[in-house]
């Protein structure tokens, strides 16, 4: 049995009520995860792991999140649940899986939770989504909202840009936050807004806010793990790079290629030998 396949000691799983109870307390630590090995590494350090629809761009090479399917989210949700033992795991509802009606949203969210075993789902929550959140929350689906810059709506909203910079836009984001919290979401992701707006929302709503490009005024922070680790050449303004994984991986692969070509790999340390005869 490999070291990777050994089951870690079972820890108590963080729940939606646990996250909600952290309002105003120690900041929530959240990252994205798309597979079991990375989830296993992140799990001891995180309160929440999000299987984001960003998987479409980060893992599958899509240009946006719009092409992500429910089956893709379920597949990656299952993988993350195999690696995470302690953090709450939330799965994004992809574009087109919840907008038609509350009934459609509930049916698809129930399928995600049943087939992955995750503890919550997340939807992008304009004010139009309040009835959907309320419908799901009343039927025991823990929901995280997502306001401000909403990637699934980027094509309609004019691209990936910060929100709330005009008075009208600012009020729209506040209205989204109030509607999302009132409808029953247990936490709200705020993306791409100025610090003063994030602070106002955080001080107004009674559920934790989780910022991504929304300053330290929020109740917690989330980043795309690959952005934080330096996997890509381009880094968003709001990301702090904690590593340069692309550069280190490139160097490691270059060394492997060199070792193969000069036949220094495999060496005798990496080669099986026949057992000596007992006779």
UniProtKB/Swiss-Prot annotation:
<keyword id="KW-0479">Metal-binding</keyword>
<dbReference type="GO" id="GO:0005737">
    <property type="term" value="C:cytoplasm"/>
</dbReference>
<dbReference type="GO" id="GO:0000287">
    <property type="term" value="F:magnesium ion binding"/>
</dbReference>
<feature type="binding site">
    <location>
        <position position="92"/>
    </location>
    <ligand>
        <name>3-methyl-2-oxobutanoate</name>
    </ligand>
</feature>
<dbReference type="GO" id="GO:0003864">
    <property type="term" value="F:3-methyl-2-oxobutanoate hydroxymethyltransferase activity"/>
</dbReference>
<feature type="active site" description="Proton acceptor">
    <location>
        <position position="191"/>
    </location>
</feature>
<feature type="binding site">
    <location>
        <position position="53"/>
    </location>
    <ligand>
        <name>Mg(2+)</name>
    </ligand>
</feature>
<dbReference type="InterPro" id="IPR003700">
    <property type="entry name" value="Pantoate_hydroxy_MeTrfase"/>
</dbReference>
<keyword id="KW-0808">Transferase</keyword>
<protein>
    <recommendedName>
        <fullName>3-methyl-2-oxobutanoate hydroxymethyltransferase</fullName>
        <ecNumber>2.1.2.11</ecNumber>
    </recommendedName>
</protein>
<comment type="function">
    <text>Catalyzes the reversible reaction in which hydroxymethyl group from 5,10-methylenetetrahydrofolate is transferred onto alpha-ketoisovalerate to form ketopantoate.</text>
</comment>
<feature type="binding site">
    <location>
        <position position="92"/>
    </location>
    <ligand>
        <name>Mg(2+)</name>
    </ligand>
</feature>
<dbReference type="InterPro" id="IPR015813">
    <property type="entry name" value="Pyrv/PenolPyrv_kinase-like_dom"/>
</dbReference>
<keyword id="KW-0566">Pantothenate biosynthesis</keyword>
<dbReference type="InterPro" id="IPR040442">
    <property type="entry name" value="Pyrv_kinase-like_dom_sf"/>
</dbReference>
<comment type="pathway">
    <text>Cofactor biosynthesis; (R)-pantothenate biosynthesis; (R)-pantoate from 3-methyl-2-oxobutanoate: step 1/2.</text>
</comment>
<keyword id="KW-0460">Magnesium</keyword>
<dbReference type="GO" id="GO:0015940">
    <property type="term" value="P:pantothenate biosynthetic process"/>
</dbReference>
<feature type="binding site">
    <location>
        <begin position="53"/>
        <end position="54"/>
    </location>
    <ligand>
        <name>3-methyl-2-oxobutanoate</name>
    </ligand>
</feature>
<dbReference type="Pfam" id="PF02548">
    <property type="entry name" value="Pantoate_transf"/>
</dbReference>
<comment type="subunit">
    <text>Homodecamer; pentamer of dimers.</text>
</comment>
<comment type="similarity">
    <text>Belongs to the PanB family.</text>
</comment>
<feature type="binding site">
    <location>
        <position position="122"/>
    </location>
    <ligand>
        <name>3-methyl-2-oxobutanoate</name>
    </ligand>
</feature>
<keyword id="KW-0963">Cytoplasm</keyword>
<feature type="binding site">
    <location>
        <position position="124"/>
    </location>
    <ligand>
        <name>Mg(2+)</name>
    </ligand>
</feature>
């Amino acid at each position: 049995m490999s070291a990777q396949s050994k089951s870690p000691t079972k820890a108590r799983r963080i729940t939606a009520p646990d996250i909600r109870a952290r309002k105003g307390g120690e900041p929530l630590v959240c990252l994205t995860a798309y597979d079991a090995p990375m989830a296993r590494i992140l799990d001891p350090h995180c309160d929440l792991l999000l299987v984001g629809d960003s998987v479409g761009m980060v893992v599958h090479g899509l240009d946006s999140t719009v092409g992500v399917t429910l089956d893709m989210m379920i597949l990656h949700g299952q993988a993350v649940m195999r690696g995470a033992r302690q953090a709450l795991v939330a799965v994004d509802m992809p574009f087109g899986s919840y907008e038609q009606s509350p009934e459609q949203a509930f049916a698809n969210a129930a399928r995600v939770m049943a087939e992955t075993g995750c503890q919550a789902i997340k939807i992008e929550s304009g004010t139009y989504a309040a009835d959907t959140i309320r419908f799901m929350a009343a039927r025991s689906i823990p929901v995280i909202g997502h306001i401000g810059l909403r990637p699934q709506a980027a094509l309609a909203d004019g691209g990936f840009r910060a929100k709330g910079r005009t008075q009208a836009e600012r009020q729209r984001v506040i209205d989204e936050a109030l509607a999302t919290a009132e409808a029953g979401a247990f936490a709200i992701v705020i993306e791409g807004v100025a610090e003063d707006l994030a602070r106002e929302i955080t001080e107004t709503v009674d559920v934790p806010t989780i910022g991504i490009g929304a300053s330290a005024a929020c109740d917690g922070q989330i980043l795309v793990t690959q952005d934080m680790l330096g996997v890509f050449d381009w880094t968003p303004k709001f990301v702090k790079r904690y590593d340069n994984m692309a550069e280190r991986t490139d160097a490691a692969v270059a060394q492997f290629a060199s070792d193969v070509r000069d036949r220094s790999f495999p060496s005798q340390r990496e080669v099986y030998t026949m057992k000596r005869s007992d006779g």
